[in-house]
């Protein structure tokens, strides 16, 4: 018996003396993110107690659990905003623990997008300029950055709001600008921490549907911390945290 891995990541079982049939194909998924035995303490408080999590490319995973379960601490480590005390983290087939702070920052800016409950848009810049910031940091020219940002804002229904500053936008519009900013470098992975927590039910529903649209159009991978049961129900998989561990 031989095993052959095709470029499409399909595992084929075959015997040289038997004709191949499609029923022998077993599709396997490439891991976009893999966390192994993640531990984190702050002083004497042990927050994460050996968390294991694997997320496939193109998957939408929500993390739920009571306040204090360790959800946001885990998201910060998965998103490389903080380092674990021990454990291994792989994103897009790269192990990150040995990267210097500078290289980790560069990796984060190119490979990862963030969406938070509060949009954190810079008030002195308009929507287009806010979306361009990560592209500028990545070294993209102003012309190319503005082209990418314009396409994203138009796709998100903000083509006529690009020159408006954050205080001239509604809450839902501000969050869509934040989504465009998260996407401008075409990241491999997007992390969201309570992304609809500051929105009314209508804007929250539109944001949740937007995540599905982005996954369909760009094969984006999402890891989302949320208390919103509607958003959790839309995801491909819901994982629950309790006392610093994933319990299901």
Region locations from a protein language model:
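ABC-family P-loop ATPase nucleotide-binding domain
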Residues: 11-14, 21-39, 247-248
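ABC family nucleotide-binding domain
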Residues: 33-241
């Amino acid at each position: 018996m031989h095993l052959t891995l095709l470029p499409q990541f399909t595992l084929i079982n075959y015997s040289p003396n038997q004709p191949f049939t499609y029923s022998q194909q077993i599709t396997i998924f490439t891991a976009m993110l893999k966390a192994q035995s993640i531990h984190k303490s702050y002083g004497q408080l042990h927050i994460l107690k050996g968390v294991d999590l694997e997320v496939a490319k193109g998957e939408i995973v929500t993390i739920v659990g009571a306040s204090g379960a360790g959800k946001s601490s885990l998201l910060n480590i998965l998103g490389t905003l903080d380092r674990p005390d021990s454990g291994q983290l792989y994103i897009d087939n790269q192990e990150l623990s040995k990267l210097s702070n500078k290289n980790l920052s560069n990796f984060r800016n190119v490979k990862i997008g963030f969406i938070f409950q509060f949009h954190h848009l810079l008030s002195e810049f308009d929507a287009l300029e806010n979306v361009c910031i990560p592209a500028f940091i990545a070294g993209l020219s102003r012309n190319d950055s503005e082209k990418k940002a314009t396409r994203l804002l138009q796709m998100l229904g903000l083509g006529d709001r690009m020159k408006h500053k954050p205080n001239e936008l509604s809450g839902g519009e501000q969050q869509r600008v934040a989504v465009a900013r998260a996407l401008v470098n075409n990241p491999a992975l997007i992390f969201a921490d309570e992304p609809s927590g500051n929105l009314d039910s209508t804007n929250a529903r539109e944001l949740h549907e937007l995540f599905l649209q982005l996954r369909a159009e760009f094969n984006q991978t999402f890891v989302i911390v949320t208390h919103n049961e509607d958003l959790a129900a839309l995801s491909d998989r819901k994982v629950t945290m309790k006392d610093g561990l994933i319990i299901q």
